[in-house]
């Protein structure tokens, strides 16, 4: 169908309750899994080859803080300005990865459990801010406007994905209680990273499990039998400098 306007909403989350419940469950899952780590397991490698668990704890703290900044400055935040370029997803991924790496390297030295505690407070405070501004624009990617609610959906998906990362690091399985809400959050908040063909909500035949679709869209499992690379090479390169600095800090603490 031909569009008669220059923008559209990204699969809007018209009802806040399901995604906010799933968001809260994602925060809780991260905290519960983090409580199972000890000094040795915090040093274990996560499914993202260039991040160990203690680095992921710091990243979570940074992301929660960034969400507040983006909301404060929406729709002209630095994240909104980046998305407004309409750049290819790979280009956006490289820029976001460099930002993540720089923030992680600059993070104050603290035990991983302390980072998780700050993350929990910040993430829950963010959710409490959303009700009154749910339908307002947060940013735009190409011709798609993402609302504040859509960005909350993206955050919801990120929390569950990182819970999966922590669980796999511990050698246990993880699956959200409401994968459909997580999938809806991804669709609403991540138009620059579309779902794999054949996943629920994609245009092709619907056959993939909702949670597997999110894992595939995020690069954690292959999108297809032909795609065996779970982590893009550009992400590994972007994270390398911060990884080295963080590991020097870790050695200094020992």
Locate the predicted segments by residue:
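A short, structured beta-strand-centered segment in the mid-to-C-terminal lobe
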Residues: 93-121
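Flexible "arm" and connector segments at domain edges
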Residues: 97-104, 127, 163, 170
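Structured surface interface patches that mediate subunit assembly and partner/cofactor docking
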Residues: 2-21, 26, 40-44, 69-85, ...
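Primarily hydrophobic membrane-targeting regions of prokaryotic envelope proteins
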Residues: 27-30, 51-67, 126, 159-166
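HAMP-domain connector/hinge
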Residues: 45-49
């Amino acid at each position: 169908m031909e569009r008669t306007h220059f923008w559209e909403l990204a699969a809007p989350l018209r009802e806040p309750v399901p995604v906010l419940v799933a968001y809260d469950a994602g925060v809780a899952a991260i905290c519960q899994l983090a409580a199972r780590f000890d000094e040795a397991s915090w040093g274990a490698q996560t499914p993202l080859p260039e991040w160990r668990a203690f680095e992921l704890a710091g990243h979570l703290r940074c992301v929660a803080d960034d969400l507040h900044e983006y909301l404060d400055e929406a729709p002209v935040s630095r994240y909104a300005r980046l998305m407004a370029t309409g750049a290819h997803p790979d280009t956006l991924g490289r820029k976001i990865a460099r930002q993540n790496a720089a923030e992680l390297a600059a993070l104050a030295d603290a035990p991983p459990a302390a980072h998780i505690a700050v993350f929990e407070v910040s993430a829950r405070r963010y959710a409490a801010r959303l009700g009154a501004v749910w339908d307002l624009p947060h940013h735009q990617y190409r011709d798609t406007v993402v609302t504040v609610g859509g960005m909350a959906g993206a955050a919801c998906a990120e929390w569950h994905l990182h819970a999966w990362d922590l669980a796999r690091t511990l050698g246990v399985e993880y699956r959200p209680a409401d994968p459909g809400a997580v999938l809806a959050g991804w669709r609403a908040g991540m138009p620059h990273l579309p779902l794999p063909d054949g996943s629920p909500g994609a245009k092709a035949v619907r056959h993939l499990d909702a949670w597997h679709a999110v894992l595939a869209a995020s690069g954690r499992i292959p999108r297809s039998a032909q795609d065996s690379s779970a982590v893009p090479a550009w992400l590994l390169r972007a994270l390398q400098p911060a990884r080295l600095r963080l590991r020097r800090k870790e050695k200094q603490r020992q």
